[in-house]
């Protein structure tokens, strides 16, 4: 039991014939094979649908440490589906993940995911339930012949970094106080309702005094 990181230094008191109870990991190679076989079986079962599952939305990682990166989320919000013109019940049947709990906090995230949905919808090859009687929105017979199973993630998400050229730091940038500005912005957001209420009460008192 070697010490791990910055924890307390242990003084273990072993009893119960502990050498017979050591947890071993000799099943790892077999587990790896079993997982691979399960993935292949699932891919065969759901073919010609994408092997990696439904399309996921672009979401920004939480906290200041990671919010510069984007990754795949759980599901598209109901607002995103509404703007894209896809019904929430239909979405799940055509390989679009839905998360009714998610809320869009910015216009940029909403627009990015709506665009993602529209692009996916344009590329989608939709098989008719009855081959003899295809419905509106189903793909043509020529498109169905071209259909192949996608092995990787559906429309993979990439982090794009823009390189900036080196330049001289301006005086305004030198004097800018980032931490104080963030604190002030948070305080203004927190006290917005209280200040609005006080301003309204003060305005009402002024009206009463004038009377």
From Swiss-Prot:
There is a cross-link at residue 174 (Glycyl lysine isopeptide (Lys-Gly) (interchain with G-Cter in SUMO1)). The modification N6-acetyllysine is found at residues 16, 177. One of its GO terms (cellular component) is synapse. This is Large ribosomal subunit protein eL13. InterPro entries: Ribosomal_eL13 (IPR001380), Ribosomal_eL13_CS (IPR018256). It is found in: Cytoplasm. Its main location: cytoplasm. GO terms for molecular function: structural constituent of ribosome. The gene is Rpl13. It comes from Mus musculus (Mouse). The keyword Phosphoprotein applies. Component of the large ribosomal subunit. The ribosome is a large ribonucleoprotein complex responsible for the synthesis of proteins in the cell.
């Amino acid at each position: 039991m070697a010490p791990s990181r910055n924890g307390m230094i242990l003084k273990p008191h072993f009893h119960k014939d502990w050498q017979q109870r050591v947890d071993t990991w000799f099943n790892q190679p077999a587990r790896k094979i079993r997982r691979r076989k399960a993935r292949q079986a699932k891919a065969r079962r759901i073919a010609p649908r994408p092997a990696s599952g439904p399309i996921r939305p672009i979401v920004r990682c939480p906290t200041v440490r990671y919010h510069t990166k984007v990754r795949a989320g759980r599901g598209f919000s109901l607002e995103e589906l509404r703007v894209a013109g896809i019904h929430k019940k239909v979405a799940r049947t055509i390989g679009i993940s839905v998360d009714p709990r998610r809320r869009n906090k910015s216009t940029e995230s909403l627009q990015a995911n709506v665009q993602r949905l529209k692009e996916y919808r344009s590329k989608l090859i939709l098989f008719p339930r009855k081959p003899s009687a295809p419905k509106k929105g189903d793909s043509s017979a020529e498109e169905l012949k071209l259909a192949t199973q996608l092995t990787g993630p559906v429309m993979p998400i990439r982090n794009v970094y823009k390189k900036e050229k080196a330049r001289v730091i301006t005086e305004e940038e030198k004097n800018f106080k980032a931490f104080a500005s963030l604190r002030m912005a948070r305080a203004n957001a927190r006290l917005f309702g209280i200040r609005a209420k006080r301003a309204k009460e003060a305005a009402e008192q002024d009206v009463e005094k004038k009377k």
